[in-house]
């Protein structure tokens, strides 16, 4: 008899989650003030371009060194923000702009709450195609960005860390290096939980039903198990030891090692915040510069 009552309860919980989700959207606070931290010898611009994949205009922030020689092309690092953030976050909450002084273009796209994937139930929300096709084409058309895999890298925090690793595994021909900082790598494989029903509903819209093909196609663990170690971008992973995301990061680091996929993993002190992420930047960029093609 108890089992007969489960379905109505789940339906009720889903209904409540939908109502709460609608209320949340109406009560969304305005974005925080934009106060980018710029280095002395860099130039910053905010760009809006039309994404064919999303069929709407999307913004991105770009930071370049000021002393670019004529006709010179520079490598590009795409920086993905976390959930609840926006394309200003990297330049507002870190001093990442200083790395552009080393002959590097930094591109920070708007990712909304997409996990940088093509949504399962919304054909118009093709965020993977927006990043991997539209954004890169716009950057390489309008800025001195060197084309080709040896000149491209991708890095992200939290949701953006998931996006960076997922995109690198799905498109090994696009990137030479990918870094995931405090990455939410296990989101597609998390089972249903009443305690997180609203989050599960959001994720189901992005990744599809539990154990669906779409969900498996965007699961970094599934992708890592089938990846070609000779073609996979170099993967840099780090995670704070006080984070709930640490176990999943440890697990995928072990999987990458077992599969002989070039990678490194650096757990360290800290929680899921910019204090910890900023402490990891020097090490992450040292690894990045060791793999990018720079002339």
Regions found by a protein language model. Name each.
Residues 1-10:
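Bacterial N-terminal signal peptides that target proteins for export
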